[in-house]
Amino acid sequence: MLAQATTAGSFNHHASTVLQGCRGVPAAMWSEPAGAIRRHCATIDGMDCEVAREALSARLDGERAPVPSARVDEHLGECSACRAWFTQVASQAGDLRRLAESRPVVPPVGRLGIRRAPRRQHSPMTWRRWALLCVGIAQIALGTVQGFGLDVGLTHQHPTGAGTHLLNESTSWSIALGVIMVGAALWPSAAAGLAGVLTAFVAILTGYVIVDALSGAVSTTRILTHLPVVIGAVLAIMVWRSASGPRPRPDAVAAEPDIVLPDNASRGRRRGHLWPTDGSAA
C-alpha cells in the first residue's frame, strides 16, 4: 500500500493537469507521455480541441486517427471553434487537391527514337540566280582566256602588261570571282559576302579605269572585260536581298500588355518572407 501511494504521489503536475476531469485511467498509464494520456482521456471523457483537430487533420490526409471517429464527430458537433477550423482546413485541402489535379500529366519517358534530320530543301532557282551563274561562268572563261595569254585588250602601257606576275595575279583574281559567283548562285547564303567584296572591288576598279582611260593606258576592249564583274556585283546584291526575305515591320509586332498590379502591390523583387496567417493543420 505504501508503494502504491508513493507511485501515485510521484505522478507529475503536467499529467495531473491533462487528467483533470478524466475518469478511468489505468495506473499503468501514469508513466506514459502526456499526449498518450490525453488521447486516452478523449476516448472516455470530454475531448480536447487539440486532440480533435489532430484527428481531423489525419482524416483529411487519409491517415489513421488517434481517437475514434465517433468521438471526434461528437466533439465537432459541440465545438463551434473546431467546426470553423475544420471548414477552413477542408477548403484549403480541396483547393490544393484541385491545383495538383489541374497540372498536366507528363508521360513517362520511353526509349528515345533518334531520327535523321530532314534534308534541307533548296529554294528554286530564280532568274537572278541563273543570271549570276551565267556571269560567273563568263568571268571564269575570261580569266582562263587571259591566263592562256590571249588578247583581252591589254596594252603595253597598262601597268599589268609590263609584269608577268601582275598579269597572273589579275588572272587568278578574275577566275576566283567567277567561281564565287557560281557558288553564290547555287547557295544564296554566300551571296551576302560576295556582294560586299564585289561592291568594294567595283568601286576601286572604277577609279582606276577612269584614270587609265583618260591617260590612254587602257583600251575599250579591256574596259568591256570588266562588265561581268559590275553585273555580278548587282546580281549578288539582288540574290542576297531576295534570300534574306523581307524584314518584319515594327508595327506588325504586337505590344505586350502591361501587368496591372493591385493598389497595395509594388514592383520589384520581394525582400520579406511569407508567414502563415492561421495555425498549422496538424
UniProtKB/Swiss-Prot annotation:
Entry keyword set: Cell membrane, Membrane, Transmembrane, Transmembrane helix
InterPro entries listed in its UniProt record: Znf_put (IPR027383)
TM stretches of this protein: 130-150, 170-190, 191-211, 223-243
Keyword Kinase set for record: no
Recorded GO CC terms: peptidoglycan-based cell wall; plasma membrane
Compartment annotation: Cell membrane
Name of the molecule in the record: Uncharacterized protein Rv0093c
Lineage: Bacteria, Bacillati, Actinomycetota, Actinomycetes, Mycobacteriales
